Structure formats: C-alpha cells, structure tokens
C-alpha cells in the first residue's frame, strides 16, 4: 500500500524543531558533554566518545537511507531523492567517519539517549517529507535555489570536516587536554566546525525549499551557535594569550 503524505506530522515535527531551537537560546546553558562534562554532569554514566557518537548519529543515517532504499534506483533521480541523498551523505560521515576518529571525552549516556531520539525523529521527518510530500518541477536542478543551496551545503560540509581535522590534530591519542585551535576558519572564529555545519543546513534548507529543512536549519543555528559562544568563552577564560580578534561564530562580527 503506497504511503501518502500527511501534513499534520510534518507541521508538528517542524514546529518541534523550531521550539527546541528557541528553548536552547532561552535557557542559554551549555550542553553537558565535551568540555562541560565534568562541571555539569560529574556523576553521569558515560560511554567512550567513539561509541557514543556512533550510536547517537546512526539513526540520522539509517532512517532516511532506509526510506531511500525503497525508491527506484537511478543516478539522477527526482530532486527529492537527490536532496535526501545529501542529508544521508552528511550523516554517513558523522556516523562512520567522524565517530571513529574523534578523540573526545567520555559521553554521558543521558545526552546520548537525547541525541539518539532527536536524530531518529529528525531523520524520519526529513526523509518522510522529501520522499512522500515534496513536489519539485522537472527544472528544479537548474533553479538558483537548488544550485546555491547545494553549493552552500558542500562548502559547509568541507569547512566542518576540515575544522574537525584541525581539532583532532591538537591531541595525541588518549589526551584530553585543551589547546588553542589554529588554521582554517579557526583563524577568525572559535566555532569553525559549528559554522561549517550551520552553513550546511542553511544550504540544505535553500536547496529543498521546505519547512522541515528550514526548521532544522533554525535549530542548528540556535544550538550550534550557542555552543560556539560557550566554546569561545571557555577559550578566552582558559588561555590568556587567546587571539583578541577571534570571534565566536561569525568572522569579524560575533
């Protein structure tokens, strides 16, 4: 039996994403993992960072990839399946590459569970909308929104991957000490990796021209932007020689 688009869950899911982003800004507290594990969740049960990131990110790849697997195979299929393929590409990297290379601190299980639920819900929302609800004209591939959006997505993903590489090189295996990131966009901002991912999802929202993607981009801006702000404040307090001209997220501005 074919699946038909139901707008109510799409609207509810999009509203939930936007609300979560707004709540993150309202409370303005750092999430209790990474740099903030010891101060915010000292007694939490934890998993090794690699296992935790793998488990958390996995549903963001598996759920939409499973939806895509049921669609007709073609190199350049309908725009919706190509766009969902970009989403899957990001989370393939996060699940199978980033998680296996990260050298972060042990991860609190409570945040792993929250992240897992979020990733599953968001993966289902984006996949369901694009495959069963989205309608694009045949000329969407030549539309400026698609072209510019895909360009921003690829640019942001490149910035994100390169910035993560710089951060990994700051530590030897087993180290948990902090050093000042140098190079790439870290020359200008403390949250270069977060900026890259925000650019990705803004590009994705533009390319898909969809409410769920816009809501996810808004959530990413709020959540990752706030995390960049807290990282910047952390670095400024920890290092007396931290570059004075470096901003938190947006070069020369914020």
Curated annotation (Swiss-Prot):
One GO cellular component, as annotated: endoplasmic reticulum membrane
Q: How does it sit in the membrane?
A: Multi-pass membrane protein
Q: What does this protein do?
A: Converts testosterone (T) into 5-alpha-dihydrotestosterone (DHT) and progesterone or corticosterone into their corresponding 5-alpha-3-oxosteroids. It plays a central role in sexual differentiation and androgen physiology.
Sorted alphabetically, which PROSITE patterns does this protein's record hold? Answer: S5A_REDUCTASE (PS50244)
* This protein's UniProt keywords: Differentiation, Endoplasmic reticulum, Lipid metabolism, Membrane, Microsome, NADP, Oxidoreductase, Sexual differentiation, Transmembrane, Transmembrane helix
Can you tell me which family this protein belongs to? Belongs to the steroid 5-alpha reductase family.
Places the protein is found:
Microsome membrane; Endoplasmic reticulum membrane
Q: What EC number(s) are associated with this protein in UniProt? A: 1.3.1.22
- Record field: transmembrane: 8-28, 72-92, 146-166, 206-226
Tell me what this protein is called. 3-oxo-5-alpha-steroid 4-dehydrogenase 2
InterPro entries membership: 3-oxo-5-alpha-steroid_4-DH (IPR016636), 3-oxo-5_a-steroid_4-DH_C (IPR001104), SRD5A/TECR (IPR039357)
Query: Origin organism of this chain?
Result: Sus scrofa (Pig)
GO BP: any one term:
cell differentiation
Q: Which Gene Ontology MF annotations are present?
A: 3-oxo-5-alpha-steroid 4-dehydrogenase (NADP+) activity; testosterone dehydrogenase [NAD(P)+] activity
Which major enzyme category is it? oxidoreductase
What's its catalytic activity? Answer: a 3-oxo-5alpha-steroid + NADP(+) = a 3-oxo-Delta(4)-steroid + NADPH + H(+); 17beta-hydroxy-5alpha-androstan-3-one + NADP(+) = testosterone + NADPH + H(+); 5alpha-pregnane-3,20-dione + NADP(+) = progesterone + NADPH + H(+)
């Amino acid at each position: 039996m074919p699946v038909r688009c139901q707008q109510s869950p799409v609207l509810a899911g999009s509203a939930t994403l936007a609300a979560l982003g707004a709540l993150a800004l309202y409370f303005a507290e750092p999430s209790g993992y990474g740099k903030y594990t010891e101060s915010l969740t000292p007694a939490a049960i934890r998993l090794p960072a690699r296992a935790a990131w793998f488990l958390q990110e996995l549903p963001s790849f598996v759920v939409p990839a499973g939806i895509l697997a049921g669609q007709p195979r073609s190199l350049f299929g309908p725009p919706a399946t190509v766009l969902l393929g970009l989403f899957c590409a990001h989370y393939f990297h996060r699940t199978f590459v980033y998680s296996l290379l990260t050298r972060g601190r042990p991860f609190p299980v409570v945040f792993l569970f929250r992240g897992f639920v979020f990733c599953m819900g968001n993966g289902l929302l984006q996949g369901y909308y694009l495959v069963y609800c989205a309608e694009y004209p045949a000329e969407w591939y030549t539309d400026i929104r698609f072209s510019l959006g895909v360009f921003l997505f690829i640019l942001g993903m490149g910035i994100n991957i390169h910035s993560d590489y710089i951060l990994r090189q700051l530590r030897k295996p087993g180290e948990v000490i902090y050093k000042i990131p140098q190079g790439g966009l870290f020359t200008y901002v403390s949250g270069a990796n977060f900026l890259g991912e925000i650019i990705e999802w803004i590009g994705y929202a533009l390319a898909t021209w969809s409410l769920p993607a816009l809501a996810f981009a808004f959530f990413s801006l709020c959540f990752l932007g706030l995390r960049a702000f807290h990282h910047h404040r952390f670095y400024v307090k920890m290092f007396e020689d931290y570059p004075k001209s470096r901003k938190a997220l947006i070069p020369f501005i914020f």
